[in-house]
């Protein structure tokens, strides 16, 4: 019986963190779920900036309220707290915080700190035990989590086509702490963005197959264009992906092409970049889930005579074992394929392997 329960449970644990949430309140159309996890995590690497304790916890809630038969209000908040730093250090941050309204089959609208629509597709490969999903990053235009997202989503195309989902999104400017690009939440150039728009379409074809595409285009700030790498009026992202999720097998791949939107270490952005991620996993009924993946990001026509350079390139081999719905452990080996050379050193790009060992309690 335990084996059968695990085989049904594990796929649910691999989606949003709130899938295993604890229901705190559910009465009169009002519902509140609390979720979280503690990851006792350690990295082993020759890279001194990565090697060592990486323990952290995440805590969040999801709530909704039934206004009437066709209108539902909802909100979500998620916070991360690092457990590998001293008590006098402020090392925590908000991952998401947004509120919205759902209008029956007409779709939903929300605003706040959320995921960019590009992640609707690239998230399909962001399922590795520890690493992965790093051909893009947070607070990088509309590629992952960011501030000031206004998002309209529609599931099953107004209730007419099962599995056909689309989203349209706007992101407001997040500029610098002072000067021409100043906004109330100023930040460094690598995490700034101008006004942006994006959209995504995903279609579940049935039998476990899915296909999706997403695009985004954001204005760049003048501060960003003061950097040497990746000058241009706009940052653009075009992505497409495929996945298969059935019969205990998970396969996914995504290809993304960007213009002035993929970071070149700590130097700026690539004028053009080609990003590729592919992952394969299998879920055994007794709780073991092995995983293998390949990720590469290649920058094109880089300044200072660097030309074409790999910004990221590695093979990932790992496995997760689920004791039950609340407890798991994993190992993840990032086999770095980048060479240590002038470019990687100047850009601050690590070329060392990393082995991650984690023990996770989640609710």
From Swiss-Prot:
Alphabetized PANTHER family for the sequence: OUTER MEMBRANE PORIN C, PROTEIN YDDL-RELATED
Entry keyword Transmembrane: yes
Main location: membrane
Polar residues compositional bias, start-end: 174-187
UniProt-listed GO biological process terms: monoatomic ion transmembrane transport
One Gene Ontology cellular component: pore complex
Membrane topology, as annotated: Multi-pass membrane protein
Subcellular location per the Swiss-Prot or TrEMBL entry: Cell outer membrane
Role played: Forms pores that allow passive diffusion of small molecules across the outer membrane. (Microbial infection) Binds CdiA-EC536, probably acts as the outer membrane receptor for toxin CdiA-EC536 with OmpF.
Family under the similarity heading: Belongs to the Gram-negative porin family.
Gene3D superfamilies linked to this entry: Porin
Keyword presence, RNA-binding: no
The protein's name in its UniProt record: Outer membrane porin C
Record note on quaternary structure: Homotrimer. Probably forms mixed heterotrimers with OmpF; other mixed heterotrimers are also probable.
Species, as recorded: Enterobacter cloacae subsp. cloacae (strain ATCC 13047 / DSM 30054 / NBRC 13535 / NCTC 10005 / WDCM 00083 / NCDC 279-56)
Signal sequence, start to end: 1-21
Xref: PROSITE patterns: GRAM_NEG_PORIN
Keywords: Cell outer membrane, Ion transport, Membrane, Porin, Signal, Transmembrane, Transmembrane beta strand, Transport
Region (Disordered) residue spans: 174-195
Pfam families per record: Porin_1 (PF00267)
GO molecular function: porin activity
InterPro entries attached to this UniProt entry: Gram-neg_bact_OMP (IPR050298), Porin_dom_sf (IPR023614), Porin_gammaproteobac (IPR001897), Porin_Gram-ve (IPR001702), Porin_Gram-ve_CS (IPR013793)
């Amino acid at each position: 019986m335990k084996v059968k329960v695990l085989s049904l449970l594990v796929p649910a644990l691999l989606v949003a963190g709130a899938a295993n949430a604890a229901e705190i309140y559910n009465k009169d159309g009002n519902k509140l779920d609390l979720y979280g996890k503690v990851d006792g995590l350690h990295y082993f690497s020759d890279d001194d900036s990565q090697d060592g304790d990486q323990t952290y916890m995440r805590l969040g809630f999801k709530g909704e309220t039934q206004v009437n038969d066709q209108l539902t209000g909802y909100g979500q908040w998620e916070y991360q707290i690092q457990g590998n730093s001293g008590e006098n250090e402020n090392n925590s941050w908000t991952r998401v915080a947004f509120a919205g309204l759902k209008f029956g089959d007409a779709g939903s609208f929300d605003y706040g700190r959320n995921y960019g629509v590009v992640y609707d597709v690239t998230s399909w490969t962001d399922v590795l035990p520890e690493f992965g999903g790093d051909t893009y990053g947070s607070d990088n235009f509309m590629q992952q989590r960011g501030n000031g997202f206004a998002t309209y989503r529609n599931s099953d195309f107004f209730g007419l086509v099962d599995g056909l989902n689309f989203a349209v999104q706007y992101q407001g400017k997040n500029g610098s702490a002072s000067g021409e690009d100043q906004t109330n939440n100023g930040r460094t150039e690598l995490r700034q963005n101008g006004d942006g728009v994006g959209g995504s379409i995903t279609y579940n074809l049935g039998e476990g197959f899915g296909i999706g595409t997403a695009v985004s285009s954001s204005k760049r700030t003048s501060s960003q264009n003061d950097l040497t790498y990746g000058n241009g009026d706009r940052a653009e992202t075009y992505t497409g992906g495929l996945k298969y999720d059935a019969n205990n097998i998970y396969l996914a791949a995504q290809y993304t092409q960007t213009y002035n939107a993929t970071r070149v270490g700590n130097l700026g952005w690539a004028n053009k970049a080609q990003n590729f991620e592919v992952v394969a996993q299998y879920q055994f009924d007794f709780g073991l889930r092995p995983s293998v993946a390949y990720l590469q990001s290649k920058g094109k026509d880089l300044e200072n005579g660097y030309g074409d350079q790999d910004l990221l390139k590695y093979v990932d081999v790992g496995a997760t074992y689920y004791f039950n719905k609340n407890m798991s452990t994993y190992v993840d080996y990032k086999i770095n394929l980048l060479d240590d050379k002038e470019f990687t050193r100047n850009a601050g790009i690590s070329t060392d392997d990393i082995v991650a060992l984690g023990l996770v309690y989640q609710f």
